[in-house]
C-alpha cells in the first residue's frame, strides 16, 4: 500500500474501497468495482472463485455482483492482522487462505458426492438451497473440512458484508447510513 497516499486511502476507506493490484499498480476499488473490472484474483483459483460466487449469490442475492470473490480474495491476500473478514473476529487461525481453500474444497466435494459429480456452481437454485440447508445443519454426510455450519456462517457473513455493509447497501435497505464513531475532526 506504499504506492497509495494516506489521504487517498482514507477517502477510499470511507466508501468501502480496498487496495487491489491492477497491472502491477495498487488502486483503490470497492469489491463491486473490482468484480466489474475483472480484476485478477491473487489467491483463489478460478474453480474456488466459481464456488464462492455461487455460494455467495445463493446465500445473499446480489453478492456475486457486489464482488464477494474479489473481497474475500483481497482479504486473504493481505497480512492477517489487516483483514476485515469475520473469520478474523471468530478466531480462525491465519493464514485465512488455508481456511477458505479448505472450506470451498469441502463445499465442492460434498456437492459432487451428493449430486453425481456436479460442483456447487453447476447446481440449480433448488439444489443449491437444499445443499445450503443441509450444510447449515451439519447434515452433509460427505463433508470433509472445517465445520459445515461454521463455514455456512462465515460465507453468509461475507456475502452480507459485501451486499449490505456499504452506504449503498444501507440505502437499499432504506436505512440511513450513520458512522458508529464519527471523527471529531479531519485527519
Descriptions of predicted regions:
Residues 1, 41, 57, 117, ...:
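Generic secondary-structure boundary/loop-capping signal
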Residues 1-2, 151:
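Coiled-coil-like amphipathic alpha-helices with heptad-repeat character
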Residues 3-8, 21-58:
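C-terminal segment of N-terminal export signals and the immediately downstream linker at the start
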Residues 7-10, 129:
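Generic structural signal for individual residues within well-ordered alpha-helical segments
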Residues 13-17:
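Sec-dependent signal peptide hydrophobic core
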Residues 18-19, 137:
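Residue-level marker of structural boundaries
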Residues 39-40, 49-52, 56-152:
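Flexible, low-complexity segments enriched for small/polar residues
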Residues 140-187:
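Long, amphipathic alpha-helical surface segments
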Amino acid at each position: 500500500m506504499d504506492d497509495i497516499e494516506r489521504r487517498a486511502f482514507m477517502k477510499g476507506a470511507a466508501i468501502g474501497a480496498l487496495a487491489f493490484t491492477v497491472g502491477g499498480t495498487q488502486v483503490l476499488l470497492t469489491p463491486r468495482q473490482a468484480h466489474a473490472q475483472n480484476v485478477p484474483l491473487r489467491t483463489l483459483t478460478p474453480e474456488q472463485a466459481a464456488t464462492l460466487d455461487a455460494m455467495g449469490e445463493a446465500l445473499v442475492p446480489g453478492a456475486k455482483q457486489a464482488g464477494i470473490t474479489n473481497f474475500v480474495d483481497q482479504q486473504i491476500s493481505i497480512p492477517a492482522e489487516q483483514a476485515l473478514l469475520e473469520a478474523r473476529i471468530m478466531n480462525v487461525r491465519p493464514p485465512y487462505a488455508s481456511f477458505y481453500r479448505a472450506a470451498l474444497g469441502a463445499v465442492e466435494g460434498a456437492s459432487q458426492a451428493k449430486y453425481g459429480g456436479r460442483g456447487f456452481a453447476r447446481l440449480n437454485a433448488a439444489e443449491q438451497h437444499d445443499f445450503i440447508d443441509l450444510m447449515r445443519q451439519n447434515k452433509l454426510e460427505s463433508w470433509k473440512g472445517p465445520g459445515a455450519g461454521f463455514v455456512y456462517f462465515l460465507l453468509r457473513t461475507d456475502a452480507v458484508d459485501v451486499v449490505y455493509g456499504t452506504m449503498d447497501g444501507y440505502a437499499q435497505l432504506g436505512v440511513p447510513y450513520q458512522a458508529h464513531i464519527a471523527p471529531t475532526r479531519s485527519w
